[in-house]
Amino acid sequence: MASNVLNRYLFEDLSVRGELVQLDEAYQRIISSKDYPAALQKLLGELLVSTTLLTATLKFEGSITIQLQGDGPVSLAVINGDNEQKIRGVARWEGHIADDATLHDMMGKGYMVITIEPKKGERYQGIVGLEGDNLEQVLEGYFERSEQLKTRIWIRTGEHEGKAHAAGMLIQVMPDGTGSENDFEHLEQLTNTVKNEELFTLPANELLYRLYNQEQVRLFEPQNVEFRCGCSRERSGAAIVTVDKNEIYDILASDGSVSLHCDYCGTTYSFDESDVNKLYEEAASEPKTLH
């Protein structure tokens, strides 16, 4: 069974490239960090697939963040991924969300922000309205406006054998492509036939053969996708010592401990008075850096 993997492929005779992402554990880690409503779990899965497909286009070390903001019950949904396919995500909501809520039911009047941050170089940010019925159409609109390349995206979420899965495919005309409009439409029609179970379970080579067995498809080396939030007890301790000391000891006096919660993975780090004393002692003993 295919899981937590990104595959890139090329239609050699048609100047069209493709991507296939298949996620289970990475998706499950994100939606298990909070008691997300079913529709919001689905939206996070779609956003996760979208971000992974986008990070596959990175030709440098860096990260991409796709963020949805709106005035509906869901005020924020965000997924961050990097060129190594380390991903994390979180959403914020208020009130009841129906199981069959749509993108617009959840976000209301909103927009999508795509932020590309190279480790070296300038940060880029693009903002698009939530135009279209779903995230597929919003993202296709972004590609056509920003890259001016014909792009089609398929995103699916659901359960297989009792576990949550998210998967997606992308096909896009190459910038120097010589293929015809009919070629691209033909590939669209073939990809439209893909079934959820195939996307969730089949290895890339088998799935691509089922869809495109009459085409010359070159499949590149796969890349693993992994949930990684970046939190740690050490980072939490470092954050505590940046806060006013009196404020920290006031919290200790009233609550008995200072706690920091990671929204991405759901872990809570607690520090009692002896822990906090040790943090400040270690901070005081560190050599000062002169600027």
Curated annotation (Swiss-Prot):
Disulfide bonds join C229-C231, C262-C265. It is found in: Cytoplasm. SUPFAM superfamilies: Hsp33 domain (SSF64397), HSP33 redox switch-like (SSF118352). Its main location: cytoplasm. Under oxidizing conditions two disulfide bonds are formed involving the reactive cysteines. Under reducing conditions zinc is bound to the reactive cysteines and the protein is inactive. It comes from Vibrio vulnificus (strain YJ016). The keyword Zinc applies. This is 33 kDa chaperonin. GO terms for cellular component: cytoplasm. GO terms for molecular function: protein folding chaperone; unfolded protein binding. Keywords: Chaperone, Cytoplasm, Disulfide bond, Redox-active center, Zinc. Belongs to the HSP33 family. One of its GO terms (biological process) is protein refolding. The lineage of its organism: Bacteria, Pseudomonadati, Pseudomonadota, Gammaproteobacteria, Vibrionales. Gene3D superfamilies: helix hairpin bin, Hsp33 domain, HSP33 redox switch-like. Pfam families: HSP33. It comes from the Bacteria. InterPro entries: Heat_shock_Hsp33, Heat_shock_Hsp33_C, Heat_shock_Hsp33_N, Hsp33_helix_hairpin_bin_dom_sf. Redox regulated molecular chaperone. Protects both thermally unfolding and oxidatively damaged proteins from irreversible aggregation. Plays an important role in the bacterial defense system toward oxidative stress.
